[in-house]
Amino acid sequence: MRNPVDTAMALVPMVVEQTNRGERSYDIYSRLLKERIIFLTGAVEDHMATLVCAQLLFLEAENPKKEIALYINSPGGVVTAGMAIYDTMQFIKPAVSTLCIGQAASMGSLLLAAGHKDMRFATPNSRIMVHQPSGGFQGQASDIERHARDILKMKRRLNEVYVKHTGRTYEEVEKTLDRDHFMDADEAQGWGVIDKVLTSRLEMEGEQA
């Protein structure tokens, strides 16, 4: 049985645009990319991260001074894939605004928080969840020990990223992320993951004017 998310993504609408050279058709995501809008949807994994990073780099090459909008609806996923997106967001010249629509959980919440200061938003019914990384490994005791040390190092690094972008102390972040911690949009604003809850595009445009 096919994954329903894969099925939905395969049914991508096409839009038709009139140009000087006649009609041009785009899939909806390519058309939105022309407007410097990137969608980060579904589980964060290597293939998806590669596509998001490529779009960020392409838009930087097109115009290094113009803002990029990243729309997030993700349950999280692989830490290394998410950190590839995070590092690219910090690396490129354009400011990247983030907007949560639906949910931003786990790695999705970190990417939401990583947007440019005062340009991190969520819609009123969004759900944000933060927690520490998880993993499992089987093998020799010495290998398990090495993997345990690595995941603890990863935990410290992720905590430091949240500290940088939320303004919380390391101790506050570590305590909050100890277990799954769910927040609505207002709570996420209070905790520092986002800067504002948006109910209309006019509010977003006002913030960025």
UniProtKB/Swiss-Prot annotation:
Please give the GO cellular component terms listed in this UniProt entry: cytoplasm; endopeptidase Clp complex
Q: What is its main location?
A: cytoplasm
Query: A Pfam family for this UniProt protein?
Result: CLP_protease
**Reaction catalysed by this enzyme:** Hydrolysis of proteins to small peptides in the presence of ATP and magnesium. alpha-casein is the usual test substrate. In the absence of ATP, only oligopeptides shorter than five residues are hydrolyzed (such as succinyl-Leu-Tyr-|-NHMec, and Leu-Tyr-Leu-|-Tyr-Trp, in which cleavage of the -Tyr-|-Leu- and -Tyr-|-Trp bonds also occurs)
> Biological process GO terms, please?
protein quality control for misfolded or incompletely synthesized proteins
- Keyword Cytoplasm in annotation: yes
Compartment(s) of residence: Cytoplasm
GO MF, one example: ATP-dependent peptidase activity
Q: Which UniProt keywords apply?
A: Cytoplasm, Hydrolase, Protease, Serine protease
Q: What parts of the sequence cross the membrane? A: none
The subunit field of the Swiss-Prot or TrEMBL record says:
Fourteen ClpP subunits assemble into 2 heptameric rings which stack back to back to give a disk-like structure with a central cavity, resembling the structure of eukaryotic proteasomes.
Protein family membership: Belongs to the peptidase S14 family.
**What is this protein's name?**
ATP-dependent Clp protease proteolytic subunit 2
Q: What organism does the UniProt record list as the source?
A: Rhizobium etli (strain ATCC 51251 / DSM 11541 / JCM 21823 / NBRC 15573 / CFN 42)
Q: What high-level taxonomic lineage is stated for the organism? A: Bacteria, Pseudomonadati, Pseudomonadota, Alphaproteobacteria, Hyphomicrobiales
What gene makes this protein? clpP2
